[in-house]
A protein has these predicted regions:
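Receiver (REC) domain active-site loop signature in two-component systems and cognate sites
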Residues: 56
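Short hydrophobic/Thr-rich beta-strand motif most characteristic of the beta2 strand and flanking loop
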Residues: 26-33, 41
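Active-site beta3 strand of CheY-like receiver
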Residues: 45-51
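Conserved acidic carboxylate
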Residues: 9
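C-terminal output helix
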Residues: 106-116
């Protein structure tokens, strides 16, 4: 069964790279440009895992995580957070309910290993 990953990232180059990498690895991938679009996408078609940036327009990743954790249908979806902005944001994201944190710039091998470790088994 193909696993679905939702990538929530506002920077085009980063989202393009991550989506392409995940598709190459055999995942079904959906992309959202900010936390609001990401939350709505996750609610309407729940993914197996969410990868999100923290700092985005309209709704940031931390607010999106809080809403997901408060949502009945998607509250247990694993969430991996990406950011280049240091320890305070890492702590905020983990406190909000993120399951893992990846620093930018992203090491692609580490990224894929984290994805595989957080996806639920079938």
């Amino acid at each position: 069964m193909v696993k679905k990953v939702l990538v929530v990232e506002d920077h085009h180059d980063t989202s393009f790279l991550l989506c392409r990498l995940l598709k190459t690895e055999g995942y079904e991938v959906e992309h959202a440009i900010d936390g609001m679009v990401g939350f709505n996408a996750a609610e309407s078609a729940p993914p197996d895992l969410i990868v999100t940036d923290i700092q985005m327009p309209r709704m940031d990743g931390i607010e999106m995580i809080k809403r997901i954790r408060g949502s009945k249908d998607i509250s247990r979806t694993p969430i991996i957070v990406m950011s280049a902005y240091g320890k305070r944001l890492i702590d905020d994201a983990l406190e909000a309910g993120a399951d893992a944190f990846i620093e930018k710039p992203i090491d692609l091998d580490s990224f894929l290993a984290t994805i595989k470790s957080k996806l639920p088994s079938v």
